[in-house]
Amino acid sequence: MERTPDGRRLLVSRQIDAPPELVWDLFVDTRQWPRWGPSITAVECSERRIREGTTGRVRTVGGLRVSFVVTACEDCRWTWRVAGIPATGHRVETTEGGCRAVFEIPLLAAPYAAVCERALRSLDALAMERSRGD
């Protein structure tokens, strides 16, 4: 648990042996979200790479479409509101030999940690694939 700019959050993280810029690009590129996000099957967005103010809709595994707005996107950290509710934050921290990808989960959404762990495994695999040039 950690205090973030958005309040106390549960952190789920993973060390990834890839350049932080590459992992950050996977986080902000909406075309990649369905590849690493297990709860997202499609994204409709005002732009490919998010920034503060970006809006769109994600389609979930159950087919539900929910709107989102990116509330902050700077210094390798972005946050959003999904269906008007503050949702998981995303950040990348530089480490020796790579980076650490982190999800900041609102305390009321603690069960979502399992989904975030799965997302981090997928993100790691995708980053490794990109690093090798596959």
Where are these regions (language model features)?
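Hydrophobic ligand-binding cavity/cleft-lining segments
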Residues: 1-46
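Short secondary-structure boundary/capping segments
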Residues: 2-4, 48, 70, 91-93
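Well-ordered beta-strand positions in beta-sheet-rich domains
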Residues: 11-15, 65-67, 89, 102, ...
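Short beta-strand-to-loop capping motifs
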Residues: 14-18, 60, 105-107
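Glycine-rich portal/gate segments that line the openings of hydrophobic small-molecule binding cavities
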Residues: 34-35, 44-87, 98-100, 107
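Beta-strand/loop substructures that line and gate deep hydrophobic ligand-binding cavities in soluble
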Residues: 77-134
